[in-house]
Amino acid sequence: ATLDLVCAARWGYKRGALAKKKFIAIAGNIGAGKTELTSFLCRKYGLTPFFEPNEANPYLADFYKDMKTWAFRSQLFFLTAKFRLQRQLERSSGTTLQDRTLYEDAEIFAKNLHRQRYIDKRDWQMYWDLYETFSQTLAPPDLMIYLRCPVKTLRQRIRLRGREMEQDIPTPYLNRLNTLYEEWFSGYKLSPVLVLPTDKLDYVTDLVDRVDLFRQIEKHL
């Protein structure tokens, strides 16, 4: 801990950047490292985490087995759950970190399922109208951190973390999601964006990577 502080001071990192009330969102494909980064930052600096409610989604396991049947219901659950979660974090004091926002659910995951015709035109229009209504009432993030990661690395991490429902996710599905992430961030204007190549960073054990991460976050806030 002492070494962290010495190096952080040398590189210009200030804890004050995260001590103020800020909303940081962490985005990235399945297996990109969102939960790990959220947990790491919150553990190191006492921030408040808001994790994705995967385990609370009663449709998710069925969705991975039969996407066409369960896509709309699963995405609708995530949209409404994320809306309630984001309203909750707006009332929190201090800096909060959210592991995947409702923007990402709609712009990446639901849009991909609609393009694959797993969500039909009628359901999609209703979903999108609801998303636009929700998003207009929410304060956007102060910083969006995008964890960019190649599909090969995503597959390795998915296998290693061993979540049973994720093991049969098709590689083309992950490829399509990565494409949508790049499309979305090319036109994203809600907040500053910090792009991190997570297949090349080791902020957990590498002190230089860790200090560089803190410097970049501070720079964008």
Each PLM stretch: what is its role?
Residues 29:
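P-loop (Walker A) phosphate-binding loop of NTP-binding proteins
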Residues 34:
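Conserved lysine of the Walker
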Residues 70-139:
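Glycine-rich phosphate-binding loop used to anchor ATP phosphates in small-molecule kinases
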Residues 43-81:
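Conserved substrate/cofactor phosphate-moiety recognition/catalytic segment
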Residues 26:
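Hydrophobic anchor at the beta1->P-loop junction of P-loop NTPases
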Residues 108-182:
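A glycine- and Lys/Arg-enriched "phosphate-lid" helix/loop adjacent to the NTP-binding pocket
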